Amino acid sequence: MDRIHITGGTPLNGTIPISGAKNAALPLMIASLLTGETLELINVPRLADIAALTRILGNHGVDHMVVGKRPGQTAETGQTVRLTASNVIDTTAPYELVSTMRASFWVIAPLLARFGEAKVSLPGGCAIGTRPVNLLIMALEKLGAEIEIDGGYVVAKTKNGLRGAEIVFPSVTVGGTHVALMAAALAYGTTVIDNAAREPEVVDLAECLIKMGARIEGAGTSRIVVEGVARLGGTRHEVLPDRIETGTYAMAVAMTGGDVSLVNTRTDLLASALETLASTGTEVTALPDGIRVRRNGGGISPADVTTDPFPGFPTDLQAQFMALMTLAKGQSRIRETIFENRFMHVQELARLGARIRLDGDLAVVEGVERLKGAPVMATDLRASVSLVIGALAAEGETQINRVYHLDRGFEALEAKLARCGAQIERVRA
């Protein structure tokens, strides 16, 4: 099993290109099942989760082609992928494939909407609380689907096609909003989605669906209206920048000191996180093609954070921000309101010398003067990258085990950090 070795204490300086967002690319790839024409996606990151979904789509009969690199592209540049679902041979998504990644469960929506049936295994993926699929199933039932759970599979059918309806989510759900959008796009009549997720990745999916011929209004607000159409066509769409990768590297710069330009990204994708970061004494400046993050000298000021759905502070940056706060000059309080059991990184950060106390959904961080390198173990995607951030600032060497979690969500992480001066190396098993 691969490990990452980091010798900390070096400020980061230079430029880091931001990849396309995994959390946008996954639903966009799944949307290829809505049409028999080709969907071309630009700036798709090279990640384990992308490869896993490609296998799942291939199991359904979707043709997949990676277009060659353009001049000037590097290994850190996203790929262009063409997906064609003109010969779907199977509407079953088996356990051995779906269990590798939760988002693959979303294939149930386009399969049901286009073919009238789907049999999809209950999902796997990061073990963060329960993360139930009940809201996704509720949305499909509102649209007229007949659903039963049989042998660990969700079996969905519709006799005469899906029909528009009012869907009111009791809590904000990104996955539920993705599923509702894709299903409603091919449903008869009008669908209203209330308490819809407002995340940029939802907007990106809606914009792609509109290019494919869908009629959608209100994406980016809590009320989305979808007028179903008879068919969707192919299109070409560029995946939006990864706001979580952007925030992760911004916090790494803040923790180590230095001056880094994050390019191919936008401030509006994570305004709340950048505002919080600025309150810690880090200089954050918008650039024409990205964001400049600088902290040259001076201590890290403590700040309190509560995770919230967009436009609030992202839960996917909670672990990274906690790592930053371990070196703050004072106490900070971090409350997690989105997922249960998302403090699994606390025990491993403590191995580096962090002082963190947990009380339910609240983590109280007492800043320390320094961290010291130690062997640590990644438990999930975001926890693993928080350990990378901590290790970059720690004295001495840190060995991070189980880094396959990182490969699920961060493209060319070692190369991007190394080009800014980090002493980081992957040791192959």
From Swiss-Prot:
One of its GO terms (molecular function) is UDP-N-acetylglucosamine 1-carboxyvinyltransferase activity. Keywords: Cell cycle, Cell division, Cell shape, Cell wall biogenesis/degradation, Cytoplasm, Peptidoglycan synthesis, Pyruvate, Transferase. It comes from the Bacteria. Cell wall formation. Adds enolpyruvyl to UDP-N-acetylglucosamine. The modification 2-(S-cysteinyl)pyruvic acid O-phosphothioketal is found at residue 126. The active site is at 126 (proton donor). It catalyses: phosphoenolpyruvate + UDP-N-acetyl-alpha-D-glucosamine = UDP-N-acetyl-3-O-(1-carboxyvinyl)-alpha-D-glucosamine + phosphate. It is found in: Cytoplasm. Gene3D superfamilies: Enolpyruvate transferase domain (3.65.10.10). Pathway: Cell wall biogenesis; peptidoglycan biosynthesis. UDP-N-acetyl-alpha-D-glucosamine binds at residues 102, 316, 338. GO terms for biological process: cell division; cell wall organization; peptidoglycan biosynthetic process; regulation of cell shape; UDP-N-acetylgalactosamine biosynthetic process. This is UDP-N-acetylglucosamine 1-carboxyvinyltransferase. Its EC number is 2.5.1.7. It is an enzyme of class 2 (transferase). Belongs to the EPSP synthase family. MurA subfamily. The keyword Cell wall biogenesis/degradation applies. Phosphoenolpyruvate binds at residues 22-23. One of its GO terms (cellular component) is cytoplasm. The keyword Transferase applies.
